[in-house]
């Protein structure tokens, strides 16, 4: 897949997957209406804004890595040709899923809506199951020893302190 097709496919997938999971569903659950919250909640709202903005930034970065480095999309129907291990993927294997969760939790804090925390827990469980039962076996089959080395070196859900450097990567 060339970069233009990968970029278009990634943009469509961005709207359909994280756009729905982190945008449409939270809106459907809350109408994006904030609860009347006490003054002491303000720091939590600020933390929510930070999580939401950081989540959006990480998502854009992760999608860009799939296009530029992987020559494909995050969508299982149009996967990458190359294993994506650069950028934030040097720290954690699943930055895209973590970013979506950060965006949902951020909205929960901004709006003061516990339903979004419960939703984030359900989404997290779905992500973990999808990664375990589909994504990791698929990547192992597609990229073999290279993926296994990456998987051993880079945690799935809690970032490393220092970036991983594959063997032979100056």
Predicted ranges, named:
Residues 1-86, 98-170:
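Membrane-anchoring alpha-helices and their flanking helix-loop junctions
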Residues 94:
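Extended, alpha-helix-rich binding/interface surfaces that flank or overlap catalytic cores
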Residues 89:
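Solvent-exposed interhelical
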